[in-house]
Amino acid sequence: MSSTHSTGPSIGIDFGTTNSSIALARSGAVELVSFPTAGGTTESFRSVLYLEQRKHAGRTQIKGFTGPQAIENYLEAEHKGRLIQSLKSYLTSRTLSGTEVFGRRYSVEDLISRILTDLRLNAERQFERPIRHATVGRPVRFVGAESDEDDAFAVERLRRAFLHAGFESVVFEMEPIAAAYAYESTLDHDELILIGDFGGGTSDFSLLHVGPGVRARGRTAKDLLGNSGLGLAGDSFDARIVRKLVSPALGSESFERSYAQAKDRPASIIPAAPAWIYANLERWHYLSFLKTRNVAEILKSAHARAQEPEKIEALINLIEEGLGYQLHQAVQRLKIELSHQETAEFRFRDGSMDIVAAVNRKEFEGWIADELRSIERCVDRLLADSNVLARDVDRVFLTGGTSFVPAVRRIFEIHFGASRVRTGNEFTSVARGLALRAQEMDARA
């Protein structure tokens, strides 16, 4: 039978919270899509959408950009539009069906489909054929999911977004299992492996048998011993950095002025600005929604009452000037530097803001201690539910940007031994595995 669909082969798409990538497997060889950037090309496409208003022929139009072009146009714009990050994190929310941008209503699926459309068009240009079928990664547990029903709801929203983007069929595969296929392609023997896939929004784990023998006899349900996941990863680590270093400089620990000067009356303990604003500041996918008239009025009032009005002014400037991306980059730089060295300096300077702080790795690991414990418990639960002892696992393969964090890797080195822990192609292994899985399914079609 034909090994491809009538409208071309299936491709593998890793639509991630922070980054996305696409790959096509042909005769066992995997080719990743390269995306143009101002400085050359990249195989990692930022999962961001930038919308702005432009005048054309006397009419105002809403122009959209995605990926590297979104960042470039956002940075060049004198008057910032809306930069929307981490859209994948909205998928479980039943209360957030969409948002209004420049007076036009967009559903979450509409926004995601804009990114997916550009991913598809880039793939079509490189492979010189129509792309209508995809094997798509999904986390074991979506951000915000509290039940299997929440995950199913998120999958259906994501499926609709793919259909809106011009795809005709979509097959979903667990992201850690996809990473396992990529790892399997390097083996000349069978192994029982634990895969840890750490993205921006989720940490996912799978325990399964892989190898040439497994492929030769044909995969069965018994080869997969278990999956486990939780809705925290790199973005959760970022939130801790924002809470510790950024929010206090923007007034999170500031209070209203006390008008009671008498000694027998306590000073004001009422926060100058509501806590939910700072909670949204910590989450990249909510940051763009702070730029509203309601928030502006709240902060104007807070500025008038604050003991430290200059901090509230800095917060207002951050929101009004749309500096979320610059803040995100500063946080990312600190996290990356602390993954490679013991100390680093956090720097975020823009206008009325001048935040500089020295941070050491031990201090950072203290900030993310709760998240690290959650990851460790998730792995322990997977082993227990699968009736597998740590010593029986042949290899641990870690992928995703957060796998670079030494404290994350240490969890697995302690449990399984450093010699059994491997990493590789941290940003593209899921897409590679999805492409191999797509080729495998096409061959059986």
Residue spans for each PLM region:
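Helical "lid/coupling" subdomains associated with nucleotide-phosphate turnover
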Residues: R215, A239-F255, A279-A445
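A short, compositionally biased
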Residues: G16-T18, E43-R46, Q341-E342
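Short acidic/polar alpha-helix capping motifs at helix-coil junctions
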Residues: G12, Q61, R157, E345-F348
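Conserved Rossmann-like nucleotide-cofactor binding loop
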Residues: T18, G201-S203
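N-terminal phosphate-binding loop and flanking beta/alpha elements of the actin-like ATPase fold
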Residues: S2-T41, P68-I195, H209-S236, I355-L389, ...
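Rossmann-like NAD(P)H-binding beta-loop-alpha module
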Residues: F198
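Phosphate-binding loop and its immediate beta->loop->alpha context
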Residues: G28-R159, L163, R240, V246-L323, ...
